[in-house]
Regions:
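Membrane-interface extramembranous regions at the lipid-water interface
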Residues: 1-36, 67-85, 108-130
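Hydrophobic alpha-helical transmembrane segments in multi-pass membrane proteins
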Residues: 28-72, 79-111
Length: 130
């Protein structure tokens, strides 16, 4: 079977997995989404200080929030943690210090290898997505 590209995982986050909070997400899916998510916000950041740029930035943020949360929940499932840890990450976005902590936690979640075997959240996505 053909391996999915990083961009395919990004597109599937908005189509197939927009509000999918069940199952698991492999590291490749996590980083594929993160790469294109960061590129979009880097481009929007250049226009964020203009009148329409602020509105566009907020609209894109609101549209991308559900797939971002669902991916984080499924990634937590892959490392055998409850998706409820996502709430702690969202709460930490409020103060500036919390943002730094949330970024570090996001990187750790994206780097830690998932459970090799099936766990209570589903089959290993590395094996089942090939």
């Amino acid at each position: 079977m053909i391996e999915k590209s990083l961009f395919t995982y990004f597109i599937e986050a908005f189509t197939k997995n927009y509000a999918n909070f069940k199952g698991r997400a492999r590291r490749k899916e996590c980083w594929g989404f993160t790469l294109f998510y960061a590129l979009i916000f880097a481009i929007l950041g250049a226009f964020a200080f203009t009148g329409i740029g602020v509105i566009l930035f907020l609209v894109v943020f609101v549209v991308t929030l559900p797939p971002s949360i669902s991916l984080t929940v499924r990634r937590l499932h892959d490392i055998n943690l409850s998706g409820w840890f996502t709430l702690y990450m969202l709460i930490m976005l409020i103060p500036v210090i919390g943002e730094a902590i949330a970024i570090i936690i996001s990187i750790v979640i994206g780097v830690v290898q998932g459970s090799a075997e099936s766990n209570k959240f589903g089959e290993n996505p590395v094996i089942s997505n090939k």
